[in-house]
Amino acid sequence: MQFKILVVGKLRNEFIKAGVNEYLKRLLPFINIKIEFLPSFSELPEKMALLKEEEIILKNIKNNEFIIILDKNGEKLSSEEFSNKLFKLTTLNPQITFVIGGIYGVSENIKKSSKFLLSLSPMTFTHEFALLILLEQIYRAFKINRNEPYHY
């Protein structure tokens, strides 16, 4: 089982970098997560930016990967439901790849190529916060799955 997270944009906020590093460290006993930061084209008009980002995202996805797109219109799951779904998926798919889009999200083609759209919240988050929240929820999912203290 391997997780990869593709993130359009860089981490700029030091406190988020610290949080991301903390959760990556906490996750090491369970899984090694690879995070790839992809260039953002936010300075371009929306359609052009989405097309350029789509091209780069698709270059970083392999055919055997189960793709989960983070999208505010995706399925909304409780932490327990996310844990159950994640561990069911990993029994069938050794490679899970999460995609966090840039300021415009991801293109419709990327959404259509994914197997699952996941919403972290009805609210919109920056790519940085989305990454941190996703890592925390993955960590929580492992703790729930193992019946270990953390989730209350």
UniProtKB/Swiss-Prot annotation:
Which Enzyme Commission number(s) are on file for it?
2.1.1.177
Q: At which positions is S-adenosyl-L-methionine bound?
A: 70, 101, 120-125
Record key words, sorted: Cytoplasm, Methyltransferase, rRNA processing, S-adenosyl-L-methionine, Transferase
The record's subcellular locations are:
Cytoplasm
User: What's one Pfam family the UniProt record gives for this protein?
Assistant: SPOUT_MTase
User: What cellular-component terms does GO give this entry?
Assistant: cytoplasm
| SUPFAM superfamilies the record matches | alpha/beta knot
Q: Does the keyword S-adenosyl-L-methionine apply?
A: yes
The answer, when asked if Magnesium is one of the entry's keywords, is: no
User: Secretion signal: which residues?
Assistant: none
Reactions this protein catalyses: pseudouridine(1915) in 23S rRNA + S-adenosyl-L-methionine = N(3)-methylpseudouridine(1915) in 23S rRNA + S-adenosyl-L-homocysteine + H(+)
The highest taxon in the source lineage is Bacteria
Broad class of where this protein is predominantly found: cytoplasm
Q: What Gene Ontology molecular function terms does this protein carry?
A: rRNA (pseudouridine-N3-)-methyltransferase activity
Q: Any idea what job this protein has?
A: Specifically methylates the pseudouridine at position 1915 (m3Psi1915) in 23S rRNA.
**What is its quaternary makeup?**
Homodimer.
- Which family does the entry's similarity section mention? Belongs to the RNA methyltransferase RlmH family.
Q: What is the protein name for this chain?
A: Ribosomal RNA large subunit methyltransferase H
